[in-house]
């Protein structure tokens, strides 16, 4: 009974979060002055952290052909990520993967109802799980593939390409404090957990 009440509170809060983020994204997207050679002018954030919604939306509009499909590895609760704008505002289908079972359970309850073509999967992503992702993905050529797992990203990205994935737009988080001139990565670690490593 207590879990049902807790879920009801979370679900109500999440509905409001979605509405607020969608409204914010629409307002920000309408107020942009787009300069084709300045990616900063493409930015807006409804669901993303740093303007990715706008950049992805701008690039998506430039695709000559699209399949309305995304893959998000590191999807969290399905609301705060790089592809939620595509799901809620652009009617995309897709695959959302996260290693945290509590977050994927919340996403399953809230986000899955917005698209019959959305699959939410609880999976701790490692280099060895790429074949599983390949098996459950509807295509190897999604319009957008977003990778944000806060560790092992480089090695996961490398393995995705080795498995044949060819996204039209590929979004990978990086740590900007090292600057664009440096090529730095961690030692691959299949047990890497951002909750314990990023304290």
Residue ranges and their predicted role:
Residues 1-43:
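Membrane-proximal basic amphipathic "stem/tether" segments
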Residues 3-6, 21-24, 62, 131-134, ...:
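Context-gated lysine
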Residues 19-27, 71-76, 122, 170-174:
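Short, functional N-terminal and low-complexity linear motifs
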Residues 28, 47, 74, 181-182:
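N-terminal, active-site-proximal structural segment of metallo-dependent hydrolase catalytic domains
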Residues 72, 85, 92-93, 140-145, ...:
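Conserved acidic-Pro-Pro-aromatic motif
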